[in-house]
Amino acid sequence: MDAVILCAGKGTRLMPLTENIPKPMLPVGGAPILERIINKIDKLVENIYLIVKYEKEIIINHFKNNDKIKFIEQTDIDGTGYAVLMAKNHISGDFLVINGDIIFDDDLTNIVNDDVKNIITLNEVDNPSNFGVIVVDNQNNIIELQEKPKNPKSNLINAGIYKFENKIFDILETLRPSERGEVELTDAIKELIKENNIKGIKLNGYWNDIGKPWDLLDANTHILKNIKTDIKGKIGKNVVIEGAVIIEEGTEIKPNTVIEGPAIIKSGAIVGPLAHIRPNTVLMENTGVGNSSEIKGSIIMKNSKVPHLSYIGDSIIGENCNMGCNTITANLRFDNKPVMVNIKEEKVKSVRKFGAIIGHNVKTGIQVSFMPGVKIGSNSWIGANCLINNDIEKDSFVYKKEEIIIKTKRK
């Protein structure tokens, strides 16, 4: 059996993090989402076909040394259905299709070993209206698919993992683009439903469709629950390490630093002195957290620095950022209500504690503060003493004008 993983989309709801990086390559628990999916299925399949398009070079360069992986560029037409169709000339039998932006616990052996040819995996949720809803009969035959319905007939949703027989390619070739101009995989599934030829199987354990920034933090927290302590690198005097913590080779933890697990500190990171790393934090490769800085429940991506006297809480900082002294991310409203975040020009409720989403190559001056839920576009500079309470577009230069009055003292 082979597998097709859909990795071509832009991931606009995760902007600014996806302004330079494809969504499947965003880190969760210290590794890209796509790498976690591939590790799940590596022993179940013979070949893995990655359907790529947006920022494809990043994906190709990361996985180019894996002989099992082949890359197919999605051309001409957008849509998940057309993405699957791109693999037609490479696959002869049954195969898996997996969305490239999901985190899940299930090992998928039940799906692979099941005699049923066409399967959609299902997950039970409290908010089915946000997803594609699946209705099944008492034998798990799928009898209806509803796309983000206002009045869902079920709390079972499409979990984005499928098994198909080769016949699906014939159906996909007959489909016309939707109103969005895309060939949709769901339209092919509806044809299988008409034929009474597709079943649903519930996934076991955790599942998360990484569609919004706080989903990254939720999945990150879940993965960190299962880590085991593995401490390498250079550990300075009076360093306190509590709970499950992974510190990779090539790191340096300077004196009097406190690290509370679960947490992961990747190779090349320099932490301290007097830094405080709190639970559910991941510091990616070559990051820096300096004197008296505190990081809590956050992801700091590659090559980014939080040098001194700063607080980063429930936030995500992109690659190659530098936070000036006393940079603060606020993460809680006075009324304890969910933090509101702009997603594609719409205000969306996130979670109770949620900080800032900072894109790539961002610099802040001294004493910059971010209000809960703000997003900072990539390649932006935020000048000293700014309080940021609105989203900032990429390539912006934000600064504050203040009049400084200088007088001669009276004698």
Curated annotation (Swiss-Prot):
Chain positions covered by the region annotation Pyrophosphorylase: 1-204
GO molecular function terms listed in the Swiss-Prot or TrEMBL record: glucosamine-1-phosphate N-acetyltransferase activity; UDP-N-acetylglucosamine diphosphorylase activity
SUPFAM superfamilies: Nucleotide-diphospho-sugar transferases (SSF53448), Trimeric LpxA-like enzymes (SSF51161)
Reactions performed catalytically: N-acetyl-alpha-D-glucosamine 1-phosphate + UTP + H(+) = UDP-N-acetyl-alpha-D-glucosamine + diphosphate; alpha-D-glucosamine 1-phosphate + acetyl-CoA = N-acetyl-alpha-D-glucosamine 1-phosphate + CoA + H(+)
Protein name (database record): Bifunctional protein GlmU
Record-listed E.C. numbers: 2.7.7.23, 2.3.1.157
Keywords tagged on the record: Acyltransferase, Multifunctional enzyme, Nucleotidyltransferase, Repeat, Transferase
Positions contributing to acetyl-CoA binding: A384, K401
Residue span of region Linker: 205-224
A GO BP annotation: UDP-N-acetylglucosamine biosynthetic process
Pathway the protein contributes to: Nucleotide-sugar biosynthesis; UDP-N-acetyl-alpha-D-glucosamine biosynthesis; N-acetyl-alpha-D-glucosamine 1-phosphate from alpha-D-glucosamine 6-phosphate (route II): step 2/2; Nucleotide-sugar biosynthesis; UDP-N-acetyl-alpha-D-glucosamine biosynthesis; UDP-N-acetyl-alpha-D-glucosamine from N-acetyl-alpha-D-glucosamine 1-phosphate: step 1/1
Pfam family of the protein (one): NTP_transferase
Active site: H308 (proton acceptor)
Record-stated family: In the N-terminal section; belongs to the N-acetylglucosamine-1-phosphate uridyltransferase family. In the C-terminal section; belongs to the transferase hexapeptide repeat family.
